[in-house]
Amino acid sequence: PERDGLWIGLTLMEYMAKSGKTLENLIEEVYAVSGPFFYDRWDLHIENDHKARVMEALAAGAYAAFGPYTVQRTETIDGYKCWLTDDEWVMFRASGTEPVLRIYAESNSRSETEAILKAAQTTLYGV
């Protein structure tokens, strides 16, 4: 889920130049296929022992829900990505170099994405 803005920007500019389409046109095309989606990331600065407990709990499948968001399935390819009820997701990645737990989320609205992040943070601080 990390972003490489320079590469993405150059790729978009190249495609826009070749196709003659504006950025707005491209966004409309994507939304026509996928619908709108909103992504955000929060970095939680927590003690390493707390971070380790959270990651152990995620590995054990200890979280069935984050607030009102029920976990449907979990992927473990790059952290712990929990798919929620309506194709939203929340993902957890622990920094290996600092006391930080990164939480990523995506849904079909900005307010829902923020609510997912808040619910995840609230749940994790209960560990």
What does each model-identified segment do?
Residues P1-E106, R110-V127:
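Phosphate-binding and adjacent anionic-ligand microenvironments
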